[in-house]
Amino acid sequence: MPHRASPDLRFAVSRRQILVGAAAALGSGALAYPLRAAPLETKPRKQLLVFLLSGGASQLETWDPKPGTATGGPFRAIPTSLPGVHISELLPHTAKIMHRLAVVRSLDSKLAGHEPATYAMQAGRIVPGYPELGSAVAKLLERPEDVLPGHVVIHRTGTKGYTDLGGAGFLGAKYEPIRLIGNEPPKNLLRLPTVSETQSALIDRVRRSTDERYRQRRELGPSAAYATTYDQAKALMERREIFDLTKESTADVERYGKHEFGQNCLLARRLLMAGITSVKVTHFDWDSHQHNFHWQKVRCAEFDRTFATFIEDLAERGMLEHTHVLVTSEMGRTPQIDNLGGRGHWGKAWSVVMAGSGVKPGMVYGSTTDDGMEVKDDKISLGDLFHTNLSALGIDSSASYAIAGQTNPVADPAAKPVDALLA
């Protein structure tokens, strides 16, 4: 039975509230120096990139097609750069880079509701209060010299859907993701026009002095979390050039796509280059209860080229070998096609994709039955997947967090890494 988090952590403040509040006291303009990659090191730090296809992408129209069957639908399966492996014809660009990917076709998450499935997919278990993968990685891979936030999530404008159902859990405010809406910088990063530079500096000094006196009297997690998050807000402000996509070449903008998902992925690449440990990009509207084949075609058309471009870009820049990539939804879709041409929610047998750091490229793990209703070989759970993602980043997934004298397992002790997927 998992241990409960320290009671002190129940006071963890909202990271977004801190950022907005702190930003009003910070003063700086956009800096003139160009975007720079993280400092070169003998051994590049591991990073995480997650694509969350929110709503439930259909495994039958993406990674595990069943053409010519009663459940397969109208689309063909096409050959890929991996001999003998076929994926849906809706992913022609991805088919050309399959030799870089590892496809898992045997995930059984057992959950088929948006809210619980989104949380469990990201946390690797159904028990509430645990950190999502990105927050866990930000904690477990952090370095003393880190000044930027460890985990950033990029949503589309207009809605975050169910993707807000992750978070840092008992790790507290310091590891909450910075949530961006579109490819714009966080709101209120600039000093307010009514606050002078002198006033801003004074506010900063008072804040630091007050915080230090408070911490000397009473050591509490929220105080340290506030101070750290304030400093990270300031560091983000000083790196506003990260968000300036006008620095990207016309060719790159075209390759990634001028749609919002393409531009968000360009920003994700820039965040990784700047040294952010974990970046998650969300892609919406995969929930196809009606007209499934139309909507999956529309969503795949936008995702396919951008995703394939991003992976090739990481490889060409030498970043893929130290960046672990996960492509997932919160669940799959039913093999049965209903009378409205839709597919419902399905957690029993569906697919995810991995690439990059720690993963054996060019492989398919597991299989489903001919009708896609059940896992046939090598079933894995969400807990196993969480262990595997951590292990691919060189993290001991059997370890525990030590917080305020209590321990919490990093990953579900009842699960384990899938060694066959690990390089």
Predicted regions and their residues:
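Ligand-binding pockets and gating/stacking loops
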Residues: 1-423
